[in-house]
């Protein structure tokens, strides 16, 4: 059974809605994220999901995310997480770098399979 990929429009809409929800949760729960060291680090982890959703949003629109968009997304994420706590901002940068490696690995894995499929299909000769 082949899995269907969501359309660009639904990906943009879902990532935007989830971004707004996580942004609201960070602001509403800011007192919780300031309460202890573990909660502060958790705030950075939750903030890094904003980065992941921003990259999903940009990738669905542009299909190719460059270094500038990635750096701007990390800066925006760090600023939002820093509004909760400074340590949350720092840890969100660290977790966002982890997301960069994960997204790069997943992208390479998916697109290498697509290239192999295209090579096999186009490599056949007709007589």
Swiss-Prot record:
GO annotation, biological process: protein N-linked glycosylation
Keyword ATP-binding listed: no
Subcellular location, record wording: Membrane
Transmembrane parts of this sequence: 13-33, 41-61, 65-85, 87-107
Chief location bin: membrane
GO cellular component, one term: membrane
Top-level taxon in the UniProt lineage: Eukaryota
Membrane topology: Multi-pass membrane protein
InterPro entries in alphabetical order: KRTCAP2
Keywords per UniProt: Membrane, Transmembrane, Transmembrane helix
Disulfide bonds: none
Function field: Subunit of the oligosaccharyl transferase (OST) complex that catalyzes the initial transfer of a defined glycan (Glc(3)Man(9)GlcNAc(2) in eukaryotes) from the lipid carrier dolichol-pyrophosphate to an asparagine residue within an Asn-X-Ser/Thr consensus motif in nascent polypeptide chains, the first step in protein N-glycosylation. N-glycosylation occurs cotranslationally and the complex associates with the Sec61 complex at the channel-forming translocon complex that mediates protein translocation across the endoplasmic reticulum (ER). All subunits are required for a maximal enzyme activity.
Subunit structure: Component of the oligosaccharyltransferase (OST) complex.
Membership in a protein family: Belongs to the KRTCAP2 family.
The protein's name in its UniProt record: Protein KRTCAP2 homolog
């Amino acid at each position: 059974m082949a899995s269907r990929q969501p359309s660009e429009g639904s990906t943009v809409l879902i990532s935007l809605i989830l971004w707004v929800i996580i942004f609201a949760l960070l602001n509403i729960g800011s007192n919780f994220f300031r309460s202890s060291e573990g909660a502060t680090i958790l705030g950075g982890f939750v903030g890094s999901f904003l980065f992941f959703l921003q990259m999903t949003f940009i990738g669905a629109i542009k299909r190719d995310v460059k270094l500038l968009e990635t750096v701007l997304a990390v800066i925006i994420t760090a600023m939002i997480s820093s509004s909760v706590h400074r340590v949350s901002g720092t840890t969100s940068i660290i977790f966002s770098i982890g997301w960069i490696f994960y997204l790069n690995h997943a992208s390479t894995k998916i697109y290498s399979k697509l290239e192999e499929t295209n090579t096999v299909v186009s490599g056949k000769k007709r007589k």
